[in-house]
Amino acid sequence: DRMLEVEGGIFVAGTGFGKTVLALALINALKVPTLILVPSLTLIKQWVQRIQEHMGLLAEQIGVCAVTRDRLTGILDVASPRKLGKKEPKKLEASLSNYGLLIVDECHHAAAGSYVEILRSYAGKYLYGLTATPKRRDGKMPAVRMLIGNEIDKASVELVDYKVVKAVMSSSSKPLCPDAPYVLQVDDLVADMQRTQLVTSSVIDLVRRGRRILVLTERVEHMKILFKALQGSCDQFVMLTSDMKPKQRQAVLTKFAGISAG
């Protein structure tokens, strides 16, 4: 309701709140041609799927501008800012003139060049941003607010109804040098096979006890080492890395969704 009271601004809600469903309800309420800016192909596919599920549209009724696709209907479209922002200024303005509502998903990214060009060229009535992260490490969030508007509402959600226990283990077989560059410290951790064995054995033990485990690491190389060590112990382990091709990524996400549903 708060979003309908104003013509633009940023809605902040935690992961799992249902920002996509909220945005679709907004689209349905305003009943104007809508463009949704989404930062990645994976999220674009998720948006298209949610639109089909909640609005009863067929895939071909939803315009998509991303990677190799460039088909905007001017009615309800989902676009990658990187792809859309490559249009010549006049063509970009002409495309944007079709819309009365612009929704920027993950709007904390909107200080980037392609977003700026699009947002400056948009002249429609309604402009909303969605984010779970209303802060940027580089301090550019004020620029995002200048482009989209101030925070209009904030919601939180507890994804779990139990306390989170944070356990920190000393898992390295050799002491790290605190004065060494961070990159070198990570190199040592990745190469520490005793540490890898400790991590993977803990994961396997928890899986056998019926737990669901998410392992995060910032290096693709490290993830591949961990995944290789886990293979053979359980057929439900999946690996998702930044260097995967789109079809590989989609296959992994499909398998992951099946595991989560089970």
Sequence positions of predicted segments:
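Loop/turn-to-beta-strand initiation segments
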Residues: 33, 73-76, 98-101, 123-129, ...
